[in-house]
Amino acid sequence: IAIEDYHETNEPVVEANVVTPGFFNCHVHIMEPVGFGTDKEFTFIEKTFYTQKHLEDYINSGVTFIRVLGTENDYDMDIRDCVDAGIVKGPHMLCAGRCICMTGGHGWQGGIEADGQDECRKAARTLLKKGVDLVKIMATGGVMTKGVEPGSAQLTQEEMAVIIEEAHKAGRKTATHAQGTQGIKNALYAGIDSIEHGIFLDQ
């Protein structure tokens, strides 16, 4: 069924190619210069140009939407706004800003450390005030933070629940880094919208 009568067109026929809608990449960290596994310290300028290259690579590979789940100093929102304004070329972006983690927990170097329900609620409100599109929470440890047990539960169910409550009141979704089983369950019982990784899901 067409919305208008059929008519001839002079557009060329595309042969031996495939046309698809734009792809979504729903878990990225756009300021990671060369991926994981390096101890090199990068300057802010280096990270900025790597970010620009990553954005161009997404577009050139057909990715037209990305979900950015954790960026130091909330820089992803500045980048998002520059893309939206046409200052830099890149895909559409949903940005989480900094993650919320327990003190010394996974992602503490670039996240907001929060302990107890009051601090967690304040952290969520701070991010929402800055304009995040969603809120990222650290429910468990992770392999990229030295001295942390990747599978261990970190933020508690009660701590995550108040973060999720604040996000939902503002009309925002939530996502959690969750690898170990107990942390995954804590996040689910707290009302999380999205489990990231879920390595040790048991059902």
Q: Which ranges hold each PLM region?
A:
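Active-site gating/metal-coordination segments in enzymes
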Residues: 104-161, 193
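Active-site core of metal-dependent hydrolases
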Residues: 144-203
